[in-house]
């Protein structure tokens, strides 16, 4: 919500200022983070007000994969530690993964959320990677089964799962301080990692989050996957046949804003095939950049309508009110 207001300080309650901005900018969803959580009661009230302001039409999401770094744990509003993905993979198995999904979904639903950007399905390809620290592990087949069961648990609690991140960060390294995130994987290498994402989608995940990994051996340059039609359109849409919602990873990452303007990044993501753009540092410039691109013919109305159809389909079929 702070992006709507153009401020840096995390918003912990919403009122007329946010209501006015939601009327000005008809966004499809709001994502909250730990900084937005001041208390359990305040969080529930904020989520409720956001839906009231928009006639219950928003996706309201958070990233919670369980474990000690859950935003509900780190903010201090919950002491209910749900098994982390790493713990699930090491000792709890498929039944534990489903139970974790149920528990995550139940907690999110308690506060009014309808989206969880989980599970993290990346295959760990090197020691110390985010996939090793927070994911299921190194085996794609095992990751696939566990991801499927987490998604089933979330879905059974009426929470939309957003499986992440494709392509995975499993072997990526960052160039310099805040530079681009590079992986030397080929398209054949990526095929070895499809299963966790595809199984999560088959189990009911409504979102696929695209990473900012640059894959020069696939593209020939260092343009991030989130801005690459070779990834989103050629692989996800055409090869996989996926017609759900594609959302970018957070666009306030240094590997994006140090290389592209807010408008360039937003338009590039839509051109590449993304449907939703997650959390830019300057929402107004991103939003207006897309409008300008449509006016100039760089983006067609047909392309925008494709994304709107995917978004409305999830909201309507799943009865997110207002659709």
Where are the predicted features?
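N-terminal hydrophobic targeting/anchoring segments and the immediately downstream early-domain regions
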Residues: 1-60, 64-74, 321
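Active-site-proximal loop/short-helix segments
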Residues: 74-79, 114-133, 160, 164-181, ...
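A substrate-binding/cap region within the structured catalytic cores of diverse enzymes
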Residues: 82-151, 155
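Substrate-binding cleft of extracellular glycoside hydrolase catalytic domains
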Residues: 54-101
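Active-site mouth loops of central-metabolism enzymes
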Residues: 2-15, 82-99, 179-192, 254-259
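Short, acidic/polar
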Residues: 10-24, 96-107, 189-199, 261-268
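Second-shell residues forming the walls of enzyme active-site clefts
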Residues: 30, 39-52, 58, 68-70, ...
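Short beta-strand elements of ligand-binding domains
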Residues: 57-64, 117, 302, 307
């Amino acid at each position: 919500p702070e992006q709507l207001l153009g401020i840096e300080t995390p918003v912990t309650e919403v009122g007329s200022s946010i209501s006015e901005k939601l009327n000005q900018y008809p966004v499809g969803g709001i994502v909250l983070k730990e900084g937005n959580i001041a208390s359990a009661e305040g969080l529930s009230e904020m989520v409720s007000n956001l839906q009231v302001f928009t006639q219950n039409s928003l996706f309201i999401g958070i990233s919670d994969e369980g474990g000690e770094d859950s935003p509900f744990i780190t903010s201090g509003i919950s002491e209910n530690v749900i098994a982390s993905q790493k713990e699930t993979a090491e000792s709890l198995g498929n039944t534990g993964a489903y139970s974790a999904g149920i528990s995550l979904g139940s907690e999110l639903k308690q506060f009014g959320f309808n989206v969880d950007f989980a599970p993290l399905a990346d295959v760990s390809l090197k020691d110390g990677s985010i996939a090793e620290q927070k994911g299921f592990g190194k085996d794609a087949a095992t990751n696939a089964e566990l991801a499927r069961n987490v998604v089933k648990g979330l879905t059974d609690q009426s929470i939309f799962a957003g499986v992440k991140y494709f392509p995975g960060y499993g072997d990526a390294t960052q160039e310099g301080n805040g530079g681009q995130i590079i992986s030397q994987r080929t398209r054949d290498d990526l095929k070895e990692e499809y299963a966790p994402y595809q199984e999560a989608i088959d189990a009911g995940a409504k979102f696929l989050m695209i990473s900012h990994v640059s894959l020069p051996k696939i593209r020939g340059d260092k343009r991030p996957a989130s801005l690459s039609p070779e990834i989103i359109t050629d692989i996800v849409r055409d090869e996989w046949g996926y017609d759900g919602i594609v959302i970018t990873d957070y666009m306030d990452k240094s590997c994006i804003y140090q290389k592209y303007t807010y408008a360039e990044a937003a338009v590039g993501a839509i051109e590449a095939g993304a449907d939703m753009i997650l959390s830019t540092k300057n929402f107004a410039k991103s939003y207006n950049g897309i409008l300008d691109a449509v006016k100039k013919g760089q983006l067609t109305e047909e392309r925008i309508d494709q994304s709107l159809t995917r978004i409305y389909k999830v909201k309507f079929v799943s009865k997110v009110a207002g659709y």
